[in-house]
């Protein structure tokens, strides 16, 4: 939005551009466990128990229109879930070179290193790293990682 404002876009044009880009905006969250998602009513209790018992980790993503959180990938252990999740991100980067990627965590040093390795040599704009905000962190808990990516805004001037 800031780049659009600096580009001389009106508020209505900026809103329209952002709404048009939403289908290509992705947010993938990999919590260590589903415990907090269960506590907050975002995941069924049985799913939380089974994933914990079977050492399965899920990557979840919000459905933009409904607001529901959907499981989109699964894997056993950090390496497998990050590899499975990053496959989508890397395919997106192949299709949309120069896209923005941002990585946020609530710890998750191992997962962050795996994501950095996957992104090495890719054509993307690093939109930064940092902590997951407190609202999302409440839902995903400690040692979670979030990967967001979307096409980069192309100025008209």
Label the predicted regions:
Residues 2-157:
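Mixed-charge interfacial surface used for oligomerization/domain docking
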């Amino acid at each position: 939005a800031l780049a659009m404002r600096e580009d001389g876009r009106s508020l209505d044009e900026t809103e329209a551009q952002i709404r048009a880009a939403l289908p290509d905006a992705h947010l993938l969250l990999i919590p260590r466990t589903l415990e907090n998602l269960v506590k907050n009513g975002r995941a069924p209790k049985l799913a939380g128990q089974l994933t914990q018992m079977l050492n399965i980790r899920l990557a979840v993503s919000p459905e933009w229109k409904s607001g529901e959180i959907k499981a989109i990938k699964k894997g056993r252990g950090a390496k497998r879930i990050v590899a499975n999740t990053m496959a989508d991100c890397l395919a997106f980067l192949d299709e949309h070179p120069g896209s923005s990627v941002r990585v946020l965590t609530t710890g998750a040093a191992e997962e962050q290193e795996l994501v950095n390795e996957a992104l090495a040599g890719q054509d993307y704009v690093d939109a930064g790293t940092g902590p997951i905000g407190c609202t999302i962190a409440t839902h995903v808990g400690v040692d979670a990682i979030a990967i967001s990516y979307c096409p980069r805004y192309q100025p008209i001037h």
